[in-house]
């Protein structure tokens, strides 16, 4: 009950109207930003688009049949019903947290971010309908982001002698162009003219970065590729010259927030770095994750080496207000990633350290209990901050990182314990505690005080 009351109280306080006239713009005294890895990584984009296009009535009919007369359904229909339940549960989570702007990670698209079928379908057929007595929620502004996942490279990047152009031969791991993409929903206007994307920024152009080298042939069960040895460059010179830094994309999306003092612009800095696991003999995913995290540390430091997809150069302008958000796939204390890089970002002089590692960092009661119940990865149960974990891996992977010139009212991880409302969204006896019920990640949110 506490979780419901605290979220409701804060969400009610998030906005104040400047007048009773419906034509009068809303003035915000507070704003909630969030990130959520939705686990909508379907086998094809078309599958997800079809699920999102299903009307509310069609969803209900299928789910009722699945629960009451499953023998009348084919196996494919049963699988679809389970996925529809998952989507509805994800929508309910969003309706409970009620962000003003948030990242939707692992929301597949067409690769270019041009097809809005799935994005609009999720909004209109799920978020727009009450889920389990929660209030519907709407977002006027949506950003479908182009991605490098599954994007053909034309090279044998994994050195297995084949050029498949998908999975490990794609610029970012994906079974097709658009898998594991991300999107942004916002109730605030997106300043489209000043959006910056860095999909094509080259890894080689980050100062200090070099072609990866084979460090240990024993890192892979199959050893080093034929004709290669420790110390050799992993990527061909031609591939390295074209290698994008971002496994998906790095985007700077300015949001315009009306406040009593005038319009406030907050840069929503979003990415979803490669997970630092499934490494080859050059430790490629570890290094890729590290470099993708370093990107933001340098960007908010206004370093000059950046160029975006439109040719504009330079990092974020000094003094800008920002929120870095997304599934960063890195934990500063445990896990397989470069802990120093994520720790450096969390403790940057340009971020609100109290909100990243201090008393205002997002926490939950469900995190510690997740280990006790055996729902989270046991090997990480000795983490120093179980209340801050954001996934069933038992790691803190998902972040909302505000700039040092932003004030924070509150924050949290939507990870209810068994004694709190919403627990059915993180554990179900039939669906489990991971992607079956909602996701293997938990939604992280943070409330900004816009009066200061």
Q: Each predicted region: which residue ranges?
A:
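Gram-negative bacterial Sec-dependent N-terminal signal peptides
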Residues: 1-23
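Residues that define the transmembrane beta-barrel architecture of outer-membrane proteins
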Residues: 247-249
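N-terminal, active-site-proximal structural segment of metallo-dependent hydrolase catalytic domains
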Residues: 20-184, 213-244, 253, 257-266, ...
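Metal-dependent phosphoester-hydrolase catalytic domains
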Residues: 187-210, 214-219, 244-245, 254-255, ...
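Active-site metal-binding loops of divalent metal-dependent hydrolases
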Residues: 37-38, 107, 188, 273, ...
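Active-site His/acidic residue clusters
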Residues: 266-287
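Alpha-helical transmembrane segments and their juxtamembrane interfaces
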Residues: 14-15, 47, 337, 451
